[in-house]
Amino acid sequence: MFSINPFNFRHSVIVLCFVVGGLGFQLQAKSSPTFASSQAVVRVEHWQKRQVDIQRFLSESKDLSAVKLLFVGDSITDFWLFDQNPWVSGQKFGRRIWDETFAKPGSENYAFNIGISGDRLEHVLFRILPKAHGGLGQLDSPQLNPEFIFVMLGINNSWAAEQPVADSIYEGVLANLRALHARKPNARIVLQSLLPTNEVAKNKDVVTAVNQRLKALVLQPEFLKFTVYLDLYPLFTDSKGVQISSYFTDGLHPNDEGYKIWRDRLLEFLTQSRTVRKN
């Protein structure tokens, strides 16, 4: 019959525990990594960092009057300033195009970008309202006096949306245009169309519906003298009106090729507008 000697069993357990414990100690001594998860860190979202960066530019810029173009928007505008997509490896945004065209102080196209990823219409409105009225006052500086303000806003309000969606977006754009003109009355506001998404239903029910209303908006007497509509939608669709996916990273945000197409259209517009003004 099989039996266990109590002394031998206890001795074996003690030896095993010592060996395992010693091995564990050695492993711990050899590799004791410091994990980020064990360190206290304040959470900072991208939009918070962008607000700080925008305020720093406004505070530290030696000559805000050098800014000729102002870009206002959400992530689609914000990502002009990204090279690599920080969330998806291998995707490129518009930084190279931006640096080539809009980042040179002293040039006629030197630009300041206040687009922030994730912003809805109401968030942009809060940022451009003066501090005296409870906003962030990002346009408060009298030195900031751009020649053109490029605006693309509203697509984020198509998610978790108020109903009717197109009405909500239209009213939000309207409020932002009025606020922009109140802050910078000498600027020509360029109201850009929403870009196509990869959702056919959203394009039909929201994007094209909003674009049609924005096109009509700039012809109203209130806006006619200082606002122009720039239709980018056809540049990003094929002959059937479907989004050209090769110009986008994810069906919503342009890739570097998409930003190049956008840039080229803006330069064409600027050349035409300045020529007309001179004549």
List each language-model region with its residue ranges:
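A general structural detector for well-ordered alpha-helical segments in enzyme core domains, enriched
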Residues: I97-W98, I169-N176, L180, V206, ...
